[in-house]
Amino acid sequence: MTERAVPTIPGFTAGYVDVAGLPTWHEVHGQGPAVVLLHGGFSGAAAWSAQAPALAGAGFRVHVPERRGHAHTPDVAGPLSYDVMAGDTIAYLEAVLGDRPAHLAGWSDGAVVALLVAQRRPDLAARLVLIGQYYHSAGRAAGRDLDQWLRSAAARDFLRQGYDPFSPDGPGHFPVVYDKTLAMIESEPELDLATFGTVTAPTLVLQGDRDVVTLEHSAAVAAALPDARLAVLPGSHALPLELPGVVNPLLISFLRGAVATPASAPGFLSNG
């Protein structure tokens, strides 16, 4: 099984933890208040490779779990849904942190999962960061064009490169995960923002101005949550990968309890 190189960080570990019977791969970096980073679809811990060391270096204990059917974590029979992934994440938090709250940061599908976790279990979410999130399919800028691309042979071959070297289920299982993930993306999430009034965690909604999510959609999320602000970074769409030099100080500042300002993360637009 191919492993990716990671920086040498005091307190770094990687391996499997039992989560309600599912062997779940995770990385743990550093020491301090807990931050849990939730990756997007067809991805894994590597998506946060520019953030985990920076957050650990800033004094956080960073947990990066990989969800069922992603990277090192095996698949589970049955359909995939955001509801299922939120349940898995709650079980992970309980298994690893007990009843202690953690800061949750999610990107793309991971942001949807983080939002659902904070809705269901506000006691587990200290602060919340939603990057490139979408609570409804209408908010995706690319819409059905993205769905069609994901069904293309080129997309399938590209996504397979991030699955085959890592999955304990073997490369032959990729078509199963591919089909169930696309079935989920094409029909979910269709969430009602009016139901998220229970999200009590201070929230940062973050996106690029060229993101797959419309600005209006993210503004609606920030307006609907009880304690949220929106930050838009110019000239980018895959923020954690493209702009870590801006994203990382912004995350650190927010997770430490400060309201993000242009001084703490230059080059972004914010609604305060």
Question: Which stretches of residues belong to each language-model region?
Answer:
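Alpha/beta-hydrolase fold catalytic core
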Residues: M1-V35, G57-F60, R256-G272
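Active-site loop/oxyanion-hole signature of alpha/beta-hydrolase fold enzymes
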Residues: I9, S49-A52, G57, H63-A105
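Conserved HGGG/HGGXW glycine-rich cap/lid loop of the alpha/beta-hydrolase fold
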Residues: D18, L22-P74
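Active-site nucleophile elbow and catalytic-triad environment of alpha/beta-hydrolase enzymes
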Residues: D179-T195
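Short beta-strand/loop motif that positions the catalytic acidic residue
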Residues: T198-V199, V205-Q207
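Conserved alpha/beta-hydrolase "acid-adjacent" motif
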Residues: V212-H217
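Catalytic active-site module of serine/aspartate enzymes centered on a nucleophile-bearing elbow/loop
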Residues: A228-R229, L233-G272
